[in-house]
Structures are given as C-alpha cells and as structure tokens.
From Swiss-Prot:
Keywords: Activator, Chromatin regulator, Chromosome, Coiled coil, Methyltransferase, Nucleus, RNA-binding, S-adenosyl-L-methionine, Transcription, Transcription regulation, Transferase. It comes from the Eukaryota. It comes from Drosophila melanogaster (Fruit fly). GO terms for biological process: methylation. Residues 1091-1132 form a coiled coil. The keyword Coiled coil applies. Belongs to the class V-like SAM-binding methyltransferase superfamily. Residues 1625-1641 form the Post-SET domain. The gene is Set1. This is Histone-lysine N-methyltransferase SETD1. It is found in: Nucleus; Chromosome. Residues 1129-1145, 1205-1217 have a biased composition (Polar residues). Residues 291-300 have a biased composition (Basic residues).
Length: 1641
C-alpha cells in the first residue's frame, strides 16, 4: 500500500510513539501497517515517511503520491461552475409596487424588428427583455413592443428620448407600463376585435386555473384536441353561460385561419399539390375501391368532427376553467401559451393540408367527371380481372399496374416523372409484359399483333391517307370514352407492321434523290440569300418546324388538352390541326430539308415521315429550352409522333442475372436497323447482360404518355404565360441569328476551301512543270500519274453528318457521344497531312537514332509533297530502255505515294531516308555483288599496277567504280549501320539516301556509266557536308580504287577521325570520262526545295566558300614561290654536294624531298601516292622526276609549315586557321588538346634554334614516322553526327596531300650523335626566367616612379641603404653630412591587399580557390549573379543611351519631350475611349448583335513588346509613354475552376513548365495563361512595381486588367506585385528593386 499525506492525523497515533516522536522532527506522511482490531497482531504499527521508528529491520521506502497516475493524466482541469443569480421576474406573484423598468411602445412601424429596436436602446442602457408582438393568426406586425430594462434610469431615459418622437415615419407612444396592464388590453383589443359585440351575457374577464393549464399542456403535447368525450362533457356542463359568445368569437378566429390557409395553399403549394394530386389520382385509379372507402372515411370524419367543433370544445374548456381574478391573464403564462399556440397551429396546418388538397380536387368540376367515369370503369375492370388467370401474374410484376393503355400512360409515368424515364425504358422490366402475354390490349379490346421482324411475312401496306381519316372516325365513334389525346392521336397510327413497311418503302424511294451534297456552291449561296438553305440543318438548329418563321408572330398556346378530356371543342380543334398537317406542304425555310431543290416527288406521302423527323428533333433537343414552355400549336406536331413501343416479354432466366426487359430503344414504326444504316456513330444498344441501365429518354417518346405538368398552374397564371411568350420570342430571334451566322460561316468556309484547293493545284502545277519539261528531255514517259496522285482525296462534305440524320424519325438511337458529337465539324484551315508511307518490307539495315541536327532539320508538308512528285520523276527519268509505260507509271505512282519525308540538305550523309524498293533494285544489287566477287578475287598487287592498266579496268567495270564511291561514302558517314561486311556492298543512288532501301534502280548493265555521272552530279552541291570533294568544275575526282575489304582495315577506317583516301586511286581518267556527261538539273531543285531560308543559306554559304577558296589559292601560291626560292638557293650553295647519305648535300636533299613529298599536286598519279611510304625513305632516287615544275604545297592540318631559308636555318610558320580548310573539326580539337596537355614536359629548345645541318640528319626519324603514316592518317576522320562543311576545292587539296600528319606535329628532330645530347637536355631541363635588358630611358622612368606613383616600404629601405652607403664612401661630402635620415611613411599602396568591403561585394565572378579554373572547373552561378552579366533589354537600352554616337535630336527623349509625349498619349487614349462610347451608343439602337461583340478593352491597350528582362527571362516593356492610372493590358487566358487549376499546376511541373501563369480572379475562378494568352503573361513581379492588377466587370464578365501606378516611360519594364500567399517553401525574388522583400511568398 502507499503512504497517505496527512499532517493532522499524526496526533492520533499511540502514546508510545508520541513520546519517541516528540524529540524528532514532525513527520509529513504515515501509513498504518497493522492494527489489532483488523488483524491478529500485538500493537498498532505506523510507518512515518517510509521509516519504521525504533525498528531498523524494516526496509526504507520512499513515499510517493498514492493517487493513480493514469487518472491524474486523464483528468482535465476542473472548470469553475458559474452559478447565475436567477432573474427577478415581475409577474402576478410580485408583491408591492414594481420598479419602473417595464416600457411599452405603441404605434411602431411594421418594418422595425428586434435588431433595430435593440440599436435604439444603445444610448439608454442595457435591456433584459425585448418583445415585438404579432397577430397570432395572420402573423401581422401589431406595432406593439415591450422592453424590460435592467435599471429604472435606462427606462426613464428611453421614455424621455422616444416618447412622441417620429421613428420611421410613425410617432411612437412610449410609456412605463407596470405589470404590462396596458399592453395586455391593447393586445386583447387587436387580436379579439369581435369580443366587444357580444349579444348575450356580460363580458367575463378570463382567469386561468391550474386545471386549465394542465389541459392546455396535454393539447399542445399531442397537437390535436382530445377525443375523450366523457371527460369533455363533464367539463362542459359546469359553465354553459359563456359558450355562445366565446364560440362566435372563435368561429371568426377560425374563419380568418381558414382564409389564411387558403392563401398559403394557393401561393406556396401549387406545384407540390399537383404532383401529389397526380400521385393520389394514380393510386386512386389503380386501387379504386380502397380509395373510395378512404374518401368516404375522410368525408365522414370531416362531417363528424369538423375543425370548428373541435376548437369549440377547446374554447369551452378554457372558459369553464377561468375564475374571477382581478388581472385579465397571467403574463408569464400568456407568453408560454403563445409559443405553444404557434406550435399547435403549425401541427394543424400540416395535418389539414393533404386533406384539403384532396377535397379541393375531389370537389372540382372537371375531376368529378373523371371520378364518375373511373368509378364505373374501375368496377368493371376489377370484376373482370379478378376472375382471370392473368391477374396474379400481372400484379406480381409491379404493384397495382394494369395493362390498359389509358391507365398506364397516366399512372405509371406519373410515378417516375421525377426521374423522367418512360416506363418502356425502365431498367428493371417494370412495365414489360409477363411471359404469358403476347398481345397488347387496347382500349377497344382489339387484339393487335406484335412487332414482326423482317424475315416474317408482313401485312399489306396501309390504305391511302383519305381512308385513314374514315377509319379513324369510325373508331372515334366507338371509343367516345377515350381521352382526347388518344382519340386524336390514333389517327396517325396505322397498324404497326404496316407502318414499318410503309416507312421503309418511302425511305427507299427518296434515298436516290436526297443527296444535297450534289448541289453546287452558287445554288446554295443563292438559296441562302433567298431565305432557304442547302441540305438539312444541323440538329442543334432543328428546333422548329418549317413554319417557325411564318407563324411566329401568332403562337397559339393551349395547355389544357390533356387535363380536360371531355372538352369536345379541344378535341375537334386538335383533330383538325392534325389532319391539316398531314396535307400541308412544307415551305422552304432557313433550316429545312432541301427536297424542293432536288425534286418535289410524292409530297403527300412523305409529309408524315418528314414531320416525324422534325418533331423528333424538337423533342430530342427540348432540354435546350425551358422546361415550362407552353405547348404551341406547331400544326399538331406535338402529338403526331406518338407511338406505343412494343416491349418484348421477358424470358424466364437465371434470377441472379439482371432482369431482362423489352427493347425500348426503337419506335414500332421504324425498323431497328434504320439507325445503324443512317447514323455513322449510333448509340450502343444495351445488350442482354446489362438490363438495369435505363435507355435514352427523349420527350418525343415519353411526353404524350405523361401527365402534362405545369398545365394547371399555367392556366390560371397570366404572368407566367406572358413570360413564356416573351421567352419564346427571344428564342425565335436567337435562332434566326444563329441560322444566319452559321450560313454565313459555312459560305465563307466553303469559299475558302475552294480557293485553297485551287491554290494548291496551281502551286503544284507551277512547281512540277519545269521539272516535267526537263525530265521529258531525257525520258519519254507520260506523267499522267502525277495528277492522279496529287489530289485524289475528295474534300470532306460539310453536310455529311447533317444529311445522315435526315431520314431518321426516331432519336432513340442518338449519338452515344452526345449532342456535341452530332454537331457538324466546320472545316479548318489547317493543312491536311499526307498519310505516312508503309514500312518497307525488305530492310536489312539496323535502325539508327537521329542526331540532334537531324531532328531539328525537318521539312514542311508542302515540300514533302513536292519531293514525292520529284522523286518519282527522278526514278523514272533514270530508266532508259524498253520499259513499259504502264509499269513505269505504276512504279512512279507508288513511289510518289509511299516515299517518306526526306531530310534537308544540311543533314545529307547522316539522315536516314527511304523510298519504295522495286524488284529491279535487287536485281542490280545481284549484278553488283557478282562483279564485286570477281573484283575481290583479283590479285593483291593490283594497286601497284601502272596507270594505263587501271584506267582500262575502270572503263570496263563502271559498276565497280560506282561501288567504290559507295565504299568511300560508307567510310565517311559516321553511322553505325555499316559495321557489317555486306553493308558496304550496296549501291546508293538517291540524294538523301543513307540506308539500304535506296538501292540502285538500274535495270541494265548499260546504265552503269549513267549512274556514276548521276552520283557525281548529285554530290556536287551537297558534298559541302561530306568528305567526298568536287573540283571547281563540279566533276567528281574521287572515284576510288576499291579498298581491300579486310576487317582490320575496315575497323581502322571506321575509327579514323577524318575521311581517308584509299591507298591508290585515279582521278584523271574519270575526269575525262565524266566531263562529257550532262548533270540533271532537276536534282538541284530537289536539293534546294526545302524553304526560302534554306535556299538563301545555301547561296550565302556557296559564295562564302568561293571567296575563302580564292583567298586560299592566293596564299598558297605565295607560299610556293617562297619555298621554291629557298630550295633553289639551297641547291645552288657549294656545300650541297651529293656524296653519301650523311653528307650535307644529302641532308639538304632530304629536307627538300620531305617538303616535296608533303606538297604533291592534285594531278599526281595514284601509284606514286600509293608508294609514299617508300618515297619518303628513298626519295632521292626519283627526285629528278618532279623537277622545278612541281608545285610545293606545305599544308599540314593546322600544324607548322617548315621550310629552309638561305641561311641554312629551318624556320617554322604557323598556318592560319582559315587556310587550313582541309582540316577537320576533330583534328582541330586534337591540336587544342595537345597544346593544353599539361602532362608533357616543356619544350626546352624551339626547332628554330637548330641549324640546318642538324635538321638534315633526320632520316631514321622520318623512317619511323613514315611507318605510322597510315595509322595517323586514318585517325583523322570526323565522328558521327552532323558532318563538317568544308569548301570543295579545299577538300580536294586536303585529300591530295601526300602523307597525312594531322594529329602529330611535324617534328624535325636531330639524328646521329646529337640525339643523346637532345635527350639529355630534355631530361635535365630546368626552366628559368629570362628578361630583356632595359635601355636607359626605361631605367630613368623606373627611377622616378616614386615621384609619379608614390613610394613603398621597399623603396624606402633601398634609399636608406643607398644613403648609408654614400656616407661610408664619401664621409666628407658636405651635402650628405648636412642631411639627416628621417623615416618616411609609404605613399604607394598599389601592392597592399585591398581592405575588406563592408557592404557591397564586387560584381565580378567568383574567383577559384586554387587559382586554376582548368583543374577546378567552372563554378555554377547563382541566378542573381547570372542576371548581372547576361544580356537583357534594359542593359542594351542603357548602353545605347550612353553611346557617344547617339543623336541629340528630340527623339532622344529628354525629360521635356518625355513629359510632353506622355501627356499627348494620355489625351489620345481618353479621346479614343470617348469616341468608342459614342459609337457604342449610336450603334446600340440600330446595329446587329455582332457589332456589339467586340472587346471594349482593345481600344485602350497600349503599345507593348516583350524582350529579355533583367528580372526573370522574358519581360514586358512599354513602347510608348504611359500616364498614371491608365489601363496597360488585360490579362487573358482560360477561365478554369480551382480544382482544375491544381491539376494543371501539377501537370505543368511534371512536364517541365516551371513558370506559373495562373491568376486568381476570385475564389471560384482562375485564369490560366500558360498555353493560351497574350503579352500580359510576360509581366514580371516586382516588390516596388509600377503597375497593379485590378478585377473589373465588363458585360457581366470579370476581367483582370493591369493599370499603371505611376508614369511609365518608353522601354521601361512593366511590373506588378504577384501577392503570392505566405508559404514555407520560399521563392526567391529577383526584382532588385529598392526595398525588395527577397521572396515572392
């Protein structure tokens, strides 16, 4: 157990312990351990503060709080209980004179309520109670109020302030009223005004007793008077003297209450009563007997116990229980009784409403006839049905639903009127027939056969319309009991199967002649201007019948056709209307069918179906108009389409599946396949397994069966009828405007479409005509297929979907997408893209990824079409020979259609393109491979043969030469698709081809020579990108000798960085042979047919190339002359005598031979180029072959040019960059890498320091380098991607250079004995600083710097040393002895470290910590740092303003001109606005609706432009001065909801759109300008902006408009405060304005 804290109980312990504890400190805690009264023990034992006094054997325990810690944790702080003193009520029990705190106000204005009255009391003290009294029956404001103040002072002040004062137009009577005596009298006189006219007995003051209060309470609890007659009679007998006057008074009270209830019933419960009446009447007709019993019960009950009698009982009990007390009523009780009375009144009103509604309808004249007829009919039907076997099964489907058409239309549809689902389409088979029935019972008991499918034998067609009328009259006489809307509508319904065949037959008759798309454009436009149109109107405009315009001035409204079925006048009138409609011809309206344009055939037969179409359109789109439209007499079109859709009986199926229902989608008059035949996208018909889903509901199907809601209410409401008429006129006007606008739009679109077609045809003809003429000069094949393939697609008919709906009389199978899908899509002006060609079947190459340049360079669609035409002509023009015309036409047709988009000229050898391959291509490849096999079998020494043999071989094997071109091209293209060996064996012919598909289309070996010339001419203009160069005459000089196709060589060539020529090739013979060939000129048009910019770029690049080539030639000629002079001097010197290889002459010859071998001319034979490796070592044997006529070309790829001058020194000149045109980008990059390679040792001695004698000893080194020439030269090929663009002639010269030393500098290192010395110097090289000796002038300038710049500590130290030195050397110099040294402070602080800046940092870039940017890399700049250095519009503007060349004219915008311009622009803006308002006022009265649609804000928009901003990316700048408080621009975008805005913001962040262009208008609308908007989206945030955003309302639309806060000058950036809400994740602000907050949020 735990110790208990208690100080007082310590004194109750035993005496023995008291003595021991007296000397010690008083303990705080104790615990009783044992007590002889509780357990068997000797004495009581206590433990104090965890210690047992006198007994140390007990363990020591630390005392703690004995309360449960969990309870302490859970226990809340105890809240203090506020006990309010009860209010002192002044009532009947108050003894003595009450305080004057009760104030009564009489003659209050009716509009004064408690809140207003409380505000009147503010200056008079606090009030305890405020009551404003209303009439207990009418709830009318009585103008009496009672106020109980807290103090008498406040009551006195209120009386003095407001007594006899006018408040809200009435003079108040304010006075103190103890116990409210005057108040009660006034209330009694106002509420019981008849009490003063009593006829019998004196006026008795009412007095309430305890018994009466108890009775009152029981009444209020139950809400109705007690029916216990015995108890009430006992009470009545005691006081009969007062019954008559009280009863007369309460009857008046009840009469007022009845009048008030009638008013509420009429005004507030009209629609609900009609609906409940529908429901009650339906139940009454279904359950006739029980309803009649209930009606008699209600009548008997109402006659037995009327409300008046029950209230008389209540009043008599009240009068009986009153005693003769002096006061009229206890005031407190009266207040409570008033609240109870209100509650009781609401109970009675709620109880009596349904009863009175029923009585109201039962007692109405027109429903008496319904009841009389229904009573007899229901008795007959009940008697008949109870005896039949079908009764049980029929009522098992749905409670109290009968198969009679009259009742099913009125009762069942009223049950489901809230869901607007017709019973035929109810999902759970509530109205389909039972499995026993197959026949639908009609009102005349005639058995009609069910709907028959197409394969059943059908009945003969119906009689003509004249006989239909007679037949209906006969039936009408029989069925006089049938309601009007059934009797009349039956005339339109022949038997169901006949109607099916009749409609099908009429449709088949009219189908061939009903294509309105055949009417030409002029006829359509003329008809439109005459008020007619072509074709059927779109469904969203077919809301009217054909006479909507002619009869719109006199709409005849009748709304009581359904409710009053025995009205013979209505019956005759509607029948006459329907008969008139059947024979009335259709007049052409703006939106009607165009049968008059095609031919007026069978007008009387077609009228029924046409009217059904129009009305089905009306019904299906009735949701677009108001639901409470009056039923206008559209010539009987309202009920003409009434049909009973036959419902198939449900099958006995598995009960766990959905219930099956009949097919409720199609009317019985139209076959089920009509919708699928006429609709392109018909609705999905619910299948057997999905029966619970309701089918489409259209009012044309369900409305005739339903009770006409709103008819009764509109009959007595003239205001509502007028409102509906006005709405009808407005709708008609809007329809006319919509028709006119749509017709106008369709005319414009059709005209533009025809113009666009005409333009495209003529453009294609103009483009293709010169090509065809040039192609006809070489190929005599017809070009008719081009015209076939250019425009073989028919323009889409804009009436296609409209006309698809013309013959559909049911819209039950409406478009599953909805109304928008049924609207015609207006044709757009976008270019129709050609379908991409199918993927070629025979492709053996690997698919390759496009590089960045290839993806960027894409061609337009029009160029692609042109390319299709041209390529097909190109393919055919190549084929000379007996090719059949039909075959070539078909091939060109296929090629024109299927060719893919070709890459532009800039992506020549790296883009992949394809065209359709034919069998001839593969045959040509077979021939090529055979020739190649024989070529590969030739001996290896073929490359070393002489020139004549090779020339003969090339002439004999032209196709092999073509293969050589392709091999070189494969080596030069940087793609990976040529890694396989067989890829290099394929021919290439087309211009942009880089893939295996573009194979040679040569059919005969005789065409090989033609192919070579075609390739050469094709390559001339393109090969600026490529490695295959052309000479200045455009002739291809690089038909190469075939390279041996070994894997090693292929791999080396593939790895090389620059294009490599083969070991030997011949140019001269091929030049001779190709010169006679004529270049096809159509290839150039194909190349440059991309766009105007591409052509301009190509021309500019061509001129640039020619200019650079000219400069290169001049420079090279000058260099060659200088080299020849130096060589001649060396040859003539006496020291150059040839003795042996080590002689000086031999060395000079070696140098000369090296120079010559590097400068071979382009006419050098391929065999000698082949033997370059041997010639470099032993070139002295054949040096006499070249002689002085050889031109020396000292070009190496960006390396040093070396020649020897007359002094025997080898000098080194650096070739200029542009002259190195032959070098590739990769070689230049490798040179940069070599120059900046920090791992190489520094060069101790430059090559220019070596004498010519040492330079000439380089034979062994040259041998080593010559062995590596092949590898070095192969490492200079460009990598994959976009090829280099080198001039043609420079490529030729570069290719003709002998040994390729591209990546290795030409090192002329010594040979023999000096090689170890050079190596020793390189190893032990120590770099040291070398300075030039200064002249005397510089020395003097440095000496006197202490006078010009100042003196530093080092200078002072040196001067002092010099002074002391002079003292020692010249001790007797008088001027030194008289001069004493004084320390001077330093004045030159140039080398001092700069002091640390306190505030602003330098705007320089961050310095690297190690001091070396190359090793550390670059530091990433902050956005703010980058903004200081990057270009933006304001910076360029500032630089321009500080420019010295800036003119000082007034356009330079000085302050004076600036202010002048601002005031001028402000005046112009205001004048424009006033003119605009004047124009709007003038046009508003007379103009069309389109004139008022333009945006008013366009007149007030300022001249703005967007440019690079210093704040963030793009910004908006003013191009004109803007005054303060002027509108700058409207913020335009999509108006979306906040939920959509959150989704879009997440989506934008996911796809990488970091900027936010969402602008909130209010809590429900956000403007999103991310993907569509205007220049306002570029406005940046600023913490000190010059504009502000404002939400204004224009034409009931909210718009965000940016206004200027201050005058804004030209080129000043427009900014405003974004006002982002505060968030944890901060967005840094980059505005840099004064007082910038640092963050946007």
């Amino acid at each position: 157990m735990q110790d208990v804290r208690n100080i007082n109980l310590v004194n109750n312990s035993s005496n023995s312990h008291d003595s021991s504890l007296a000397n010690s400190k008083m303990p705080r805690n104790f615990k009783l351990l044992s007590d002889p009264q509780l357990v068997k023990c000797g004495t009581r034992l206590y433990r104090y503060d965890g210690l047992m006094p006198g007994d140390p054997s007990y363990p020591t325990i630390t005392p703690r709080d004995p309360r449960n810690p969990l309870i302490r944790i859970r226990a809340r702080a105890v809240e203090p209980l506020m006990l309010l003193i009860p209010r002192f009520v002044i009532d009947s029990d108050y003894v003595g004179q009450p305080p004057a705190v009760e104030v009564t106000i009489v003659n209050l204005n009716d509009n004064i309520d408690k809140q207003f009255l409380a505000s009147m009391l503010d200056k008079c003290g606090t009030s305890d109670e405020i009551n404003i009294y209303h009439h207990p029956i009418t709830n009318k404001h009585l103008g009496i109020a009672r106020i109980v103040f807290d103090s008498t002072k406040g009551a006195r002040q209120f009386v003095e302030k407001y007594n006899q004062k006018s408040v809200m137009g009435k003079i108040l009577d304010v006075f103190c009223d103890p116990f409210g005596a005057t108040l009660k009298k006034s209330l009694e006189s106002l509420t019981n005004s008849v009490a003063g006219k009593q006829l019998i007995g004196p006026k008795v003051t009412p007095q309430w007793t305890f018994q009466q209060a108890a009775l009152e309470d029981t009444e209020f609890i139950h809400g109705y008077p007690e029916k216990n007659g015995e108890h009430i009679k006992d009470i009545y007998t005691t006081q009969t003297n007062h019954e008559i006057p009280n009863r007369s008074r309460d009857r008046n009270w009840n009469r007022d209450k009845e009048r008030e209830r009638d008013r509420h019933f009429k005004e507030r419960s009209r629609h609900s009563s009609e609906r409940s009446y529908d429901r009650d009447r339906g139940m009454r007709e279904n359950v006739g007997t029980s309803i009649r019993r209930r009606r008699t019960f209600y009548r008997r009950r109402s006659s037995d116990i009327s409300p008046e009698d029950s209230r008389d009982i209540l009043i008599m009990t009240r009068e009986r229980s009153r005693d003769s007390d002096s006061r009229p009523r206890d005031y407190c009780r009266s207040r409570e009784r008033e609240s109870f009375r209100d509650r009781k009144r609401s109970h009675e009103k709620g109880r009596d409403q349904p009863r009175e509604k029923r009585e109201h309808y039962y007692n109405s004249s027109k429903d008496r006839e319904y009841r009389g007829r229904d009573r007899d009919r229901s008795a007959e039907i009940d008697q008949r049905d109870r005896g039949s076997l079908k009764y049980c099964s029929r009522y098992s489907l749905h409670e109290y639903i009968e198969t009679d058409v009259r009742r099913s239309s009125n009762t069942i549809s009223s049950y489901y009127s809230a869901s607007s689902l017709p019973i035929a389409s109810h999902g759970f088979n509530s109205c389909s027939f039972p499995s026993i029935e197959n026949i639908k019972t009609w009102s005349d008991r005639r058995a009609w056969t069910a709907f028959q499918p197409d394969f059943h034998p059908v009945q003969p067609p119906p009689p003509p319309p004249e006989e239909i009328d007679n037949w209906d009259e006969e039936e009408h006489d029989k069925n006089s009991i049938v309601p009007t809307h059934y009797g009349c509508m039956a005339k339109l319904q022949p038997p169901v199967p006949s109607n099916v065949n009749f409609a099908t037959k009429l449709q088949s008759v009219t189908q061939p002649n009903s294509d309105p798309g055949t009417v030409d454009l002029d006829t359509r436009i003329a008809l439109i201007f005459k008020g007619k149109t072509f074709g059927n109107a779109p469904p969203f405009l077919q809301m009217d019948s054909s006479d909507s315009e002619t009869d719109q001035g006199k709409p005849e409204v009748f709304s009581d056709v359904n409710s009053d079925s025995n009205n013979s006048e209505n019956k005759k009138r509607s029948c006459e209307k329907n008969n008139k409609v059947l024979h009335q011809p259709n007049e052409a309206s703006d939106i009607s069918s165009d049968e008059e344009l095609i031919g007026k055939k069978d007008k009387s037969k077609l009228s029924l179906i046409c009217e059904k179409e129009v009305n089905d359109d009306n019904m299906s789109l009735s949701s677009l108009s108001s639901q409470e439209d009056p039923i206008q007499t559209k010539e009987g079109a309202e009920y003409k389409s009434i049909m009973s859709s036959y419902m198939y009986s449900h099958s006995n199926q598995n009960p766990f599946y959905y219930h099956a229902s009949g097919y409720g989608h199609y009317l019985s008059g139209i076959p089920s396949e009509s919708a699928s035949r006429l609709f392109s996208n018909g609705a999905y018909v619910h299948s057997e397994y999905l029966k619970a889903v309701a089918s489409f509901n259209f009012d044309s199907f369900s409305k005739p069966y339903d009770y006409n809601k709103g008819a009764l209410s509109d009959q007595n409401d003239g205001i509502r009828q007028k409102v509906k008429q006005v709405i009808g006129y407005i709708v008609e006007e809007l329809k006319q405007i919509l028709k006119r606008d749509v017709n106008k739009r369709m005319i414009e679109i059709t005209a533009f479409k025809h113009f666009e077609t005409w333009w495209d045809e003529h453009t294609s003809k103009a483009r293709s005509k010169p090509l065809f003429e040039k192609a006809d000069s070489t190929v005599n094949t017809p070009l008719n297929c081009i015209k076939d393939t250019s425009y073989n697609e028919k323009n889409p008919d804009i009436n296609l979907l409209i006309n698809a709906h013309r013959e559909v009389a049911d819209f039950q199978s409406y478009s599953s997408i909805g109304l928008r899908a049924a609207m015609p899509k207006l044709p757009s002006f976008r270019r129709i893209r050609k379908h991409p060609s199918p993927i070629p079947t025979k492709r053996n190459f690997l698919e390759r990824d496009l590089s960045d340049q290839e993806e960027m360079v894409q061609r337009s669609d029009s160029d692609k079409e042109d390319s299709n035409v041209e390529i097909s002509d190109t393919a055919r023009s190549k084929i000379k020979g007996p090719v059949p015309i039909q075959e070539s036409d078909s091939k060109s047709h296929t090629s024109g259609l299927n060719s893919k988009r070709k890459g532009s000229a800039s992506s020549f050898f790296s883009s992949s393109s394809s065209s359709t391959s034919s069998e001839a291509e593969y045959e040509a490849i077979d021939c090529v491979e055979k020739a190649r096999t024989s070529e590969e079998d030739s001996p290896r020494g073929y490359g070393q043969r002489n020139l004549n043999q090779r020339t003969t071989t090339i002439r004999n094997r032209n196709l092999v030469g073509t293969m050589d071109v392709i091999n070189v091209r494969n080596l030069c293209s940087g793609s990976n698709e040529f890694k396989k060996e067989n890829v290099t064996k394929r021919t290439k012919k087309n211009i942009y081809s880089d893939t295996d598909e573009d194979n040679d289309r040569t059919l005969f070996p005789a065409l090989k020579e033609k192919n070579i010339s075609t390739i050469l001419s094709d390559l001339e203009e393109i090969s600026k990108d490529s490695c295959i160069g052309l000479d200045e005459n455009g002739i291809e000089p690089t038909i190469l000798r075939k390279i041996p196709n070994t894997p090693k060589l292929n791999e080396e060539c593939r790895r090389s960085l620059t294009p490599v020529p083969p070991p030997g090739y011949n140019e001269e013979e091929i030049k001779k042979k190709v010169d006679c060939k004529q270049k096809p000129s159509f290839e150039y048009d194909r190349i440059y047919s991309d766009s105007e910019e591409e052509k301009e770029y190509q021309e500019r690049r061509k001129r640039n190339t020619e200019y650079m080539a000219q400069m290169e030639r001049e420079f090279l000629e000058e260099q060659e002359k200088r080299i020849e002079k130096s060589l001649d001097k060396n040859l003539q010197s006496p020291n150059n005598i040839v003795k042996n290889n080590n002689s000086p002459r031999n060395k000079n010859d070696e140098t000369r031979k090296t120079a010559i071998s590097q400068t071979r001319s382009c006419f050098e034979s391929a065999s000698k180029v082949d033997t370059t490796l041997v010639n470099i070592i032993s070139v002295e044997n054949d040096i006499n072959e070249f002689g002085p006529h050889e031109e020396g070309d000292v070009l190496t790829n960006g390396c040093n040019k070396m020649y020897t001058n007359s002094k025997g020194k080898t000098k080194r000149t650096q070739s200029p960059v542009y002259s190195e045109g032959g070098s590739s980008q990769a070689s230049q990059a490798s040179q940069v890498a070599l120059e900046h390679c920090y791992s190489l040792p520094p060069h101790s001695v430059s090559l220019g320091d070596y004498p010519s004698g040492k330079v000439n000893e380089t034979k062994n080194i040259l041998k080593r380098e010559a062995e590596n020439i092949a590898i070095v030269s192969q490492m200079t090929r460009t990598g994959p991607g976009r090829p280099r663009k080198d001039p043609i002639c420079i490529q030729k010269k570069k290719r003709d250079l002998a040994p390729r030393m591209s990546n290795v500098k030409s090192k002329m290192t010594p040979n023999g004995d000096e090689w170890p010395d050079l190596a020793h110097k390189n190893v032990h090289f120590v770099p040291c600083d070398m300075y030039k000796t200064r002249d005397q002038n510089e020395e003097m300038v440095i000496l006197y710097t202490f006078l010009t710049k100042g003196i530093d500590a080092e200078d002072i130290n040196f001067i002092k040393m010099s002074y002391l030195d002079h003292l020692h050397k010249e001790p007797y110099a008088m001027f030194l002895n008289n001069t004493h040294w004084v320390d001077h402070c330093t004045t030159d602080r140039a080398f001092w470290p700069p002091p640390s800046k306190k505030r602003r940092k330098d705007d320089e870039l961050i310095r690297h910590k190690t001091g070396c940017a190359r090793t550390e890399g670059f530091y990433k700049l902050d956005v703010r740092e980058k903004a200081k250095h990057k270009y933006h519009y304001a910076k360029a503007n500032t630089e321009d303003s500080f420019n010295e060349d800036r003119s000082d004219e007034p356009t330079a915008l000085t302050n004076h001109h600036h202010n002048k311009l601002i005031s001028k622009m402000q005046g112009i803006s205001r004048e424009a606005r006033s003119n605009q308002r004047r124009l709007l006022t003038a046009f508003g009265s007379m103009g069309e609706s389109e004139l008022l649609k333009f945006n008013q804000l366009k007149f007030r928009k300022k001249q703005l432009k967007f440019a690079k901003s210093a704040i963030h990316d793009w910004g908006l700048f003013a191009m004109e001065p803007i005054a303060a408080d002027e509108m700058v621009i409207e913020y335009v975008g999509q108006m979306i909801r906040p939920v959509v805005a959150d989704l879009r913001e997440t989506k934008y962040e996911a796809i990488g759109i970091g900027s936010s262009y969402l602008f909130r208008i209010d809590m429900e609308t956000i403007i999103d300008a991310t993907k569509c908007g205007n220049l306002a989206r570029f406005i940046n945030h600023s913490c000190n902006p010059n504009c502000y955003a404002k939400v204004i309302t224009i034409e009931s639309e909210k718009k965000i408009v940016i206004y200027s806060k201050q005058p804004i000058g030209i080129n000043e950036e427009i900014t405003y405060d974004y006002k982002f809400p505060l968030e944890d994740e901060k967005i840094p602000c980059l505005c840099g304005a004064q007082g910038c907050r640092g963050t946007l949020n």
